[in-house]
Structures are given as structure tokens and as C-alpha cells.
């Protein structure tokens, strides 16, 4: 039996998650499909970073922000699929069929593309056996600062992320060393100066050539590095290794011949501020959508999502209101409001 949804959202980052919430608010039967095992998009790459620029929201850690987004997205019980990679979308009469890499088919009246910059995966360290240390002390992101307290840390990379981590970890760590394969760091000059002033040791023209394990072979104990100019090598004892070599962005989504959407820079979908694209029934929100006057920040993402969902609502129901009702007067929240107020009034023990 085919389950047909009003809207299928592709992408579980901030744009997709808020679209799921707003679709429920507009009374749409909603499905969200995310290729990764976790929802949250690229914010997951920086769980310890503070986000400052969301209206009415005090500075919030990326990890907490994602948890709140997910909780909000589930308000109206959408169907959510993770570990599900969409690779092809076709148009069939009045429906869209969303095909996944495993051969599944999902049927929908509309599609909302919220895939951001694509499927993002860190560039791995290309040394034999490196993968076995990913469960111990080889890291591709900083999930928790607590992990690095009083530790000797080696960071490989010279971009903004690498030097930001060096600056942020230096007050906590026993020592921080940055190695970079080129002769000049690509991070912002001011951040590099901040790292140097904080006591971070920076070694350019240097790469990791070998990882040496501890006695029980469960973690990295020594790292061998080589200077590409002098050809000198040395071995350093470390507690934690962070690899910051950038990210691979996979953009494998394709369409059948009946679907044509112009792209900018051969990736971003050109559309309108309303979330509409050149293909009726396909909408977009967030980083993947390009239009004049777009705000490429999180706060703009939420407006993109609301506009796209409102466009979907009127596409499916031309007589529907163009915008959703404000939450303070929306009957959908009546019971939820009562429950929250009652909890606020009950004294804590």
C-alpha cells in the first residue's frame, strides 16, 4: 500500500527540521528523510561552538541547539527517517516518487529540498590503520571539551576550524601542537596570532606520517611527523589527535527528465524567496536555495523554511491562508500551552 505524504522534506539540518515543525503547524502530512545517522546537519560538526545570532535566543551550544530543533520538529509527529540516502526523484502524474539508495520508494504530493551543502563527511587521515583509533583518541571533530582537559593534543590542519580548536583547547589542555602541510596557515591572521599568544606550538611544512599505538593497541601513543622541506622526522608522545583536513560534500541527488531546476554554481537551486523553484511541486529552503537578497545565516534558514511550507500549503490548497496563524492564538497549541502553564505553576520540590 502506498502512503502518500503532502510533503517530503529531504535533509535533516536546521532548514529541514524547522520545515517539519512548520509543516505540521500548517496541517500537512509530513515525512523527513536524512542521509546521516543523526539529525542536525552541519551544526553537528561544532557541538561545543556557541551560537549567538538567533533572535530571542541567548548564546547556545550547537549540541543543545540541535536537541531543541529536533524536539520542536517532532511536535506534530512527522515521519522521520535517518540513515536513508535519497539519490533520485521522479515525477509521475500528480505525484513525486523519491528513490533511495537502497531501492525504497516514497510517494509525495510535493518535495521540499533542504539538503544544505550536501552530505558532509570529514576528510579522513589516509594512513594505514588510522580508522581503528577513531573509537579512542583520533578525532575529526571536538564533541566535548572535557575530553581534552590536561591532555597533550596534536592538531593536523591549518584552516579556521583547526586554529579555532587550538585556541579554545589551549587553556584546558596540557599542550597543543598544530602541524600543517603548507608553509603558511590559511586561517584568519588574527586567530593565528591568538593561538600563538596562547602558547600553541605551530609547525608548518609538517605532516603526520605514522601513528604508533600503546601497549594494548587500543589508542595512539606516539605520532611520527616529517618536515617536507628539511626531510627531518620526529616522534611526539600525545594523548589526543585531532584531524581537521576539511570536508567532502557529496551532492548525488538527481532528477528524471521531466524535472528541470536551474542551478547556481552548478549546485544551488535557483528559486524565489517564497521557496518556489522552476519546477511546480518542488520547493527549497536553507543553504541549497539561492535567490536575490537571501540571508545565509541560521536566522534566514527559518524564514526560508516557513516561506517554503506556506507556498506548499497554498500549492496543495489554493484557498488556504497564505501564512500560518501566530502560535499565541493557534488552537493547535491550546492543549500544549495548558500543559506547559500547569507545569510552571506547580511548585518544584
UniProtKB/Swiss-Prot annotation:
Disulphide bond pairs: none
NADP in keyword set: yes
UniProt-annotated binding residues for FAD: 34, 42, 46, 86, 120, 287, 328
Recorded family membership: Belongs to the ferredoxin--NADP reductase type 2 family.
Source lineage: Bacteria, Bacillati, Bacillota, Bacilli, Bacillales
Matches recorded under Gene3D superfamilies: FAD/NAD(P)-binding domain
Cofactor note: Binds 1 FAD per subunit.
Entry keyword Transport: no
Protein name: Ferredoxin--NADP reductase 3
Assigned keywords, A-Z: FAD, Flavoprotein, NADP, Oxidoreductase
Chemical reaction(s) catalysed: 2 reduced [2Fe-2S]-[ferredoxin] + NADP(+) + H(+) = 2 oxidized [2Fe-2S]-[ferredoxin] + NADPH
Known cofactor(s): FAD
The enzyme's E.C. designation: 1.18.1.2
Native organism: Lysinibacillus sphaericus (strain C3-41)
Subunit structure: Homodimer.
MF term (GO), any: NADP binding
InterPro entries: FAD/NAD-bd_sf, FAD/NAD-binding_dom, Fd--NADP_Rdtase_type_2, Ferredoxin-NADP_redctase_2
